Amino acid sequence: MNIPTKFTTSKIRSDFLEFFKNKGHKIVPSAPLVPSNDPTLLFTNSGMVQFKDVFLGAEKRSEVRVADVQCCLRAGGKHNDLDSVGYTARHHTFFEMLGNWSFGDYFKKEAIMWAWELLTQVWELPPERLLVTVYHTDDESYALWRDMVGVPEDRIVRIGDNKGAPFASDNFWQMADTGPCGPCTEIFYDHGEHIPGGPPGSPGEDGDRFIEIWNLVFMQFDRQSDGTLVPLPTPCVDTGMGLERLAAILQHVHTNYEIDLFQTLILKAAELTAVADVQNKSLCVIADHSRACAFLIVDGVLPSNEGRGYVLRRIIRRALRHGWMLGVRQPFFNNMVPTLIAVMGDAYPKLQAAAESVMRTLLAEEERFAETLDVGMKIFNEVAAKVANGVIPGSDAFRLYDTYGFPVDLTADIARERGMRVDMAGFEAAMTQQRKTARAAGKFGRGVQLSAERAATLSPTVFLGYEQLQADDLRVVALLSDGGLTDSASVGDEVIVLTDRTPFYAESGGQVGDIGTLMASDGVRLEVTDTQKLMGQFHGHVARIVQGGVKVGDVLSGSVAVARRKMVALNHSATHLLHCALRSVFGTHVVQKGSLVAPDRLRFDFSHFEPISAAQMTLIERMVNDEVRANHLVMIEQMGMQAALDAGAMALFGEKYGEHVRVVTMGTSVELCGGTHITRTGDIGLFKIISECGVSSGVRRIEAVTGESALNHVLAEEHRLYEVAGLIGSNANNVVNHIRQLTDRQKTLERELEKLKGKLISGTITDLLSMAVNVADVKVVAARLDGLDGKALREALDRLKLQLSDAVIVLAGVTGGKVALVTAVNGPRAMGKVKADTLLSHVATQINGRGGGRVDFAQGGGEDGPSLRSALDGVATWVKQHLN
């Protein structure tokens, strides 16, 4: 493998950031693959996602020039490249997007000039190989390319509305049907005449000759609902350039999979799968998917059967299936991680830090899927063999998904390789039939949202609740109901009240929202039943008006329920101590996956791969209580994000942090946290774990209580201990020894009982042999055996079969009014003429029972009564009829 040294992927990445740093840009880290505070988006799929609120006017940033390298994923939802990965030159699930941004600072001139400078001077691309496109009415960009940069007119292409509507063009970008939008200019690289394909805008534009490198978007308009464009007061620049695609050009290779980064991964995949041909497409799939899976796990996604976890699971299983195609039958995929870290760990230190967690998660998924893949492939082959029209029925695809864990994408992938397809409509119909009725919407308020237009007119809510639980002069700035915005509300109405300031904590970070009251001097009273955060910055008081009325502009006083807030604070601080203890006991792979901090309990979900033993549970509980008794001062500081991380503070998955963060320190625990806490750890009083369980693959859950709730739990447990001691005639101090003696005695009695049963069966066998009836040289035994359970009955049957070479046997064990039936057919004379399952059905129906089995053995049951005797007495006659 010849890996170029001048423009390695790593160097291209650092060149880009250094270039824009020197142009006055602040370099920001990649946002997580899971978007913060954006439920509409499954994954971060472009560089602009983390700045979406800035463009919408819902967030303001202090810096006006920003550059980054954004990790992106396109493997689910609207933006899904999964099916194409491995089969095309440039499709990936995971990719890196280089981007520079201007928020009301520089505009077209600088963006175009710097893009050209970086491409031609830093990366030395020949200018004659570059071609640019502009929106057909964007004369300003056209002139800048021609007059300032010097691009010949025959290499500047105007692109019109080529998507069937006004301003619907490859060169006109818009976030949605309304809102920020504007023209864009794209830079293409010309691979030369020897590669098929035409320039952008031509009939041959889909060929591989001209490859898009960089897209510069100029957001200068606000699109109205009637389609008109209104100039934005502060135009913005949003650019994006795919790192892998650029690396292929700078390294003089044709496909992204030939660049240095991918070649290293492909060689490792070839080594793990023992494949000599490194051009094998399956190696490309494995290499690509190793990046997507590792970064998803690092960003807190774990395999599951829904949402983002399901997407991760199907990517993993697609990689494993390609390994299976190459003949691999043992876990291998997790061993891609060290090589991935070697090529990307310097740029993304979080990858190195989470190496153990990533490998263990992948290994667990490999072991789980190996159990079903072989069986699932056999079923697929059976289905495919019966298909005449090349379409796999949706019902069969659903059966593979529902029973064997095959994502339908995987089934479709296999089908496509065989020239077939899946009936997706039929699959969706089966899914709809299977899916349970969606849960009713939660309590009022959670589905109500604030429009972006209205949010842009408001300032973020000022939170007063760290220092005070009661506040006056809270001005109502917005009212929302199920119908949306409203100007006023009256008695009995349920509304969400937004005020300019508030002492009420809004639910976030797992901590429940505050409750309490909002009041006015004229007697108006609202009962606040919850507080929710809207758009990440507005506190919405979910309330019911119990007296008077309220309107926008009113001034209220607010009082938080003090006792409840204190109990919540106890549990929140205890959660921090628990998190710290878990990482101390199990290692740094332990990361919070979710939490609930309520007044009566806390729930903490965390990454770990095996159940916690009783000894470990005791150790964790003791460590937390040691910190409680140490009575540490809970220190809270505001500092810059990077300074906080440098100080060892833990940032939690799924949380969105600003430039300045709140750091909560208690003892050895240091976390970024916006929640409410106690003053000293001693305020917790007592910490007690009440349960531990697994909630999904690689995720455990601990539930615990603190303070008075913990004391009440201990007292209740003690009361149960005394009750148990009383039931066995012991005392609390000696109850364990007493129970051990009782269980030992029980085991002794059970062994003695088994011996007695054996003797009883031996005697019974002798009696049964003596009562056997000869029917056409076949011995027929039909008998009632009182006191024998199913196990003893089968043992008696097996002993009889050993002593009767040709026999038909029916035994009825009777205990407590219930009958257990077993039948057997043994030997060449009876086999083929008498069937055990048919005989059992004949007997069982006479005693209101049923059963089933094979031709040589069957079992079932029924009810005791007079009919049992007649049923058994008739067996010999029934056998005789069938033998003849």
UniProtKB/Swiss-Prot annotation:
It holds the Pfam family DHHA1. SUPFAM superfamilies: Class II aaRS and biotin synthetases, Putative anticodon-binding domain of alanyl-tRNA synthetase (AlaRS), ThrRS/AlaRS common domain, Translation proteins. Belongs to the class-II aminoacyl-tRNA synthetase family. Consists of three domains; the N-terminal catalytic domain, the editing domain and the C-terminal C-Ala domain. The editing domain removes incorrectly charged amino acids, while the C-Ala domain, along with tRNA(Ala), serves as a bridge to cooperatively bring together the editing and aminoacylation centers thus stimulating deacylation of misacylated tRNAs. Its EC number is 6.1.1.7. It catalyses: tRNA(Ala) + L-alanine + ATP = L-alanyl-tRNA(Ala) + AMP + diphosphate. This is Alanine--tRNA ligase. Catalyzes the attachment of alanine to tRNA(Ala) in a two-step reaction: alanine is first activated by ATP to form Ala-AMP and then transferred to the acceptor end of tRNA(Ala). Also edits incorrectly charged Ser-tRNA(Ala) and Gly-tRNA(Ala) via its editing domain. Signal peptide: none annotated. Zn(2+) binds at residues 572, 576, 673, 677. Its main location: cytoplasm.
